Amino acid sequence: MNVLFLTMSSGLKNIETSGIYTDLIRKFRDEGHEVYVVYPRERRLRLPTEVKHEDRVHLLGVKTLNVTKTNLIEKGLGQVTLERQFKLGLEKYFGKVKFDIILYSTPPITFTKVIRYAKKRNPKAVSYLLLKDIFPQNAVDLGILTKDGLKGVLYRLFRKKEKDLYRISDYIGCMSPANVKYVIEHNPEIDPAVVEIAPNSYDIPSEISVEYGVTDHIRQKYGLPINKPIFIYGGN
């Protein structure tokens, strides 16, 4: 099976490192599938568009503008041009590959044209959205956008793109039951049967070796009790 994965994550230089996307890529690879990844190579890296092949994993780094950690103007232009750059890279380097699954995650919500292009070339492929963030609603919750006024124009624009992304997706994987419920309730045009739970992918090691005394040192450094369990909330 050939899997196409579109992502904004630039941390894919070494797929053997632990991460929600690298772990997922390795799982597909280890099950005997070919994985084709398209990700941005931001301008600050000064690297060209390039494809690397590593044991059934094909990494296409597409040269883009800076889309993270930059000013709003470049970030906006970067997002606008990203679809075209990804589409051109996909056509040039993976144009002859027949994909069975088209996988992509949010953010961003601006991959619709790339996905539509990939589905047109691969009409039998299944498109699957990994819905990590519900945007633009999360921007409203954070006070970045509003539903009225000038910012409301941006909200409605992004809301339309969000709905377009849902519409083109054969399946939508959400982080939690509450997210599933939210997506269905606020997008009644979506068939509830295609919305399901798909939490972060993580390859849990069978054992973790920790040098003696290291944990006590870390607890002391941050003023945490030595003899009590510590729970860390990761945000999802």
What are these regions (language model features)?
Residues 1-51, 55-58:
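N-terminal subdomain of nucleotide-sugar transferases
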Residues 37-94:
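A conserved catalytic-core segment of Leloir-type glycosyltransferases
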Residues 58-60, 90-111, 120-130, 171:
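Short N-terminal targeting/anchoring amphipathic segment
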Residues 175-178, 198-201:
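Carbohydrate-associated surface elements
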Residues 217, 225-236:
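Conserved donor-binding/catalytic core segment of Leloir-type glycosyltransferases
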